[in-house]
């Protein structure tokens, strides 16, 4: 069985718990990632998604219609809106375990941890789909060779 480590993205974005939502918004505006891991002393303590940010920040923040309360939403800290104690998975876990976690736990990403608890990467449903597509494509090519 294929392990999570083989299909995860080792490239993760991370921030400290006290980073402002304004800073997080700027990060999301400049990268193609949809999740940022929140670390405290190099340990995973939370996850913040672009959807979490959209829910927490006023749609009027940064516009001509902005009011003081709208601007205040950007001064909130990550720890105020992050998902605490996120569900994670080990690097040696198999992909089927990850799929079950996505379905059963209704999460959109799984931080991937080494045995010592340090962050090894991140796994998203897109990573799963790309792995499945590669497997199906390989099987299709092998069928055509027969």
Region locations from a protein language model:
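Tandem CBS (Bateman) regulatory domains
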Residues: 1-11, 49-87, 94, 99-103, ...
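A glycine-centered beta-loop-beta connector
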Residues: 28-31, 36-52, 102, 110-126
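The conserved cystathionine-beta-synthase
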Residues: 15-32, 38-39, 88-106, 113, ...
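Short, surface-exposed, polar/charged, turn-prone segments marking secondary-structure boundaries
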Residues: 35, 42-43, 64-67, 74-76, ...
């Amino acid at each position: 069985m294929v392990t999570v480590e083989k299909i995860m993205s080792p490239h993760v974005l991370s921030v400290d718990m006290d980073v402002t939502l304004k800073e997080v918004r700027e990060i999301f505006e400049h990268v193609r990632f949809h999740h940022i891991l929140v670390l405290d002393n190099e340990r995973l303590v939370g996850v913040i998604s672009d959807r979490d940010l959209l829910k927490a920040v006023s749609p009027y923040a940064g516009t001509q219609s902005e009011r003081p309360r709208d601007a205040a939403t950007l001064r909130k800290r990550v720890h105020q809106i992050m998902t605490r104690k996120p569900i994670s998975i080990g690097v040696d876990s198999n992909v089927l375990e990850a799929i079950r976690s996505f379905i059963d736990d209704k999460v959109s990403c799984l931080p991937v941890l080494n045995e010592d608890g340090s962050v090894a990467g991140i796994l998203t449903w897109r990573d799963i789909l790309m792995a499945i597509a590669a497997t199906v494509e390989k099987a299709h090519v092998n069928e055509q060779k027969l």
